[in-house]
Curated annotation (Swiss-Prot):
One of the primary rRNA binding proteins, this protein initially binds near the 5'-end of the 23S rRNA. It is important during the early stages of 50S assembly. It makes multiple contacts with different domains of the 23S rRNA in the assembled 50S subunit and ribosome. The gene is rplD. Belongs to the universal ribosomal protein uL4 family. Keywords: Ribonucleoprotein, Ribosomal protein, RNA-binding, rRNA-binding. The keyword Magnesium does not apply. HAMAP family: Ribosomal_uL4_B. This is Large ribosomal subunit protein uL4. GO terms for biological process: translation. Pfam families: Ribosomal_L4. It comes from Amoebophilus asiaticus (strain 5a2). Residues 46-77 are annotated as: Disordered.
Length: 210
């Protein structure tokens, strides 16, 4: 698949790049995508939830009423889960929701996500660029020139560019990531993928050497 190389002003440079079929043209594996996204979201969970069981509730252990003769159900402790303020049965406890996936599956999931984006025509290759100042207005103008101002976008860079990161930080629908940082969730969550020429070369090299 060939894509035109665009300037950040939206103009066509007249050059084209070829997307590797081993990365952007595979048969997508939906189950790999599902597992990787599930893994990413699970690893983001704090897992600090906690409720008290009846043995952890502070209170008297005195029997609250006599066993027989009241006409109501027998009750032994104010800490019982059936009473207000009592413990919770099988309540949540702190835990780690994360689980491990092998690198091969994660790699397949990222390739599948990139293939879907390429098939949908949602990948754009930009000529290498940088901003002289970290101006949000300049970043917004770039998105407007590319007709992406109202869509969720992900800009993939080969290395940290402080001005671009700061310029994009105040825009709610855009994010910036390095080639090494991209994951399946971010790729699918973003409607449009912007990638610089150098980042594309680095991405291809990383996948082929992994």
């Amino acid at each position: 698949m060939e894509l035109s190389v665009l300037q950040y002003t939206g103009k066509d440079t007249g050059r084209k790049v070829v997307l590797s079929d081993t990365i952007f043209g595979i048969t997508p594996n939906d189950h790999a995508i599902y597992l990787d996204v599930k893994n990413i979201l699970a690893n983001k969970r704090q897992g600090t939830h906690k409720s008290k069981e009846r043995g952890e509730i502070a209170g008297s252990t005195k029997k609250i009423k006599k066993q027989k003769g009241t006409g109501t159900a027998r009750a032994g402790s104010i800490k019982s889960p059936i009473f207000r303020g009592g413990g919770r049965v099988f309540g949540p406890k702190p835990r780690d929701y994360g689980f491990k996936l092998n690198k091969k599956l994660k790699k397949l999931a990222r390739k599948s996500a990139l293939t879907y984006k390429a098939q949908q025509g949602n990948i754009s290759v930009l000529e290498d660029f940088s901003f002289e100042m970290p101006k949000t207005k300049m970043y917004l103008e770039m998105l407007q020139n590319l007709n992406m101002a109202d869509q969720k976008t992900l800009l993939i860079l080969p290395a940290v560019d402080k001005n671009l990161v700061l310029a994009s930080r105040n825009l709610p629908n855009t994010s910036v990531a390095l080639v090494e940082q991209i994951n399946t969730y971010d790729l699918l969550y973003s409607k449009k993928i912007l990638i610089s020429e150098t980042a594309l070369s680095k991405l291809t090299e990383n996948f082929n050497n992994a």
